[in-house]
Each structure stands twice: as structure tokens, then as C-alpha cells.
Amino acid sequence: MFRRAAFIKPRLTGFIRFNSTESYNAALGGLKKDLKQAMLAKDELKKTTIRGLLSTIKNKEIDNKDKTLDEFTLFDLYSKLISQRKDSITEFLANKREDLVAKEQHEMGIIEQYRSALPVASKEEIDSKVLQLLKNLKEKEPTLQMKQAFGKIDWKTVNSEWKASPNAVKASIVQQFKNVF
């Protein structure tokens, strides 16, 4: 006659990032804190830029839900967004849209600020390590091709030993290879 009420177990409502590093979580926490500060200060440009960053990061998390996300992923993502802003600036300059150029430059400055705050090696440090590696390879094998140079690097340890993203190292190898060989 009377039915017993089913107990509903509470579920976790928040999203827990099991596959991410501590510095990745700290960077996201800093972005959210800065978003709150921008909202309180009514800084529309900074607010929309940070929201765009958080949206892009969330999309990356969805795309790579089974992979570990780290500061190097954020570095690559920020670098991609900065290059998009640079392309937009050249387009706006060609079309004489100075107002949009100023907006894109300001957004690019905000993104560069967050990129420089990440605990990764600078471009100069990466270039010096790549240059030294390529010089050592040239002494051993003077007729080395670029494809073979990529094979000589242990890509699994680039993040931990070089403190750099593999994409940044690859770009540096392409740039430095022409100078050395």
C-alpha cells in the first residue's frame, strides 16, 4: 500500500580535473580570479578576452578528455591565439581599421601576459638548447637531414627536461636547422 521512498545519492556537481597538472589548475584559477576582478572593474575588453580564453580552454579539455592537460598545452593554446591576433591585425591594417587594430593589440597583450606567467622555458632558452643540440649532431653526422634531426630527440622527455612544449621545440628546430646546416 505505502511505497518506500527511494533515496537519491547526491552527485558531484562540479567538474574535477583528474588529468591535469597543478600549474594548469593554478593558471585556470588565476584566469577565473582575473575574470572576477575584470567584472568588478567593469573592464569589458579584459572580461571578454578572459572569457574567450576560458572558452577555448574548455573546448580543448572536451577534445582531449582522455589526455593529461598541462602548462605546455596552455602555452601552445595561448601561442595559437596570439598568432590569430597577429593575423587579424595585419588584415585590419590592410583594411584601414585602426579601432579594431587597437582592440586586437590590447587582447594580444592580455594573452601574452598570461602566456609569460606560465612556468615554461622562454623562446631564447629553447633556441639555445636546440642550437647546442644541432651543433652536436652536426659534429657527429655532417650530412644530417631535418627529418633525421627530429628523430634524434626523445619527445617523451621534452616536457620534463626542456620545460617546453614539443611544438615550441619543433618550431625552434626548423628555424635553427637552416642556420647550422
Curated annotation (Swiss-Prot):
Keywords: Mitochondrion, Transit peptide. GO terms for cellular component: mitochondrion. It holds the Pfam family YqeY. The keyword Transit peptide applies. InterPro entries: Asn/Gln_tRNA_amidoTrase-B-like, YqeY/Aim41, YqeY/Aim41_N. Residues 1-18 form a transit peptide. It is found in: Mitochondrion. One of its GO terms (molecular function) is carbon-nitrogen ligase activity, with glutamine as amido-N-donor. Belongs to the AIM41 family. This is Altered inheritance of mitochondria protein 41, mitochondrial. It comes from Zygosaccharomyces rouxii (strain ATCC 2623 / CBS 732 / NBRC 1130 / NCYC 568 / NRRL Y-229).
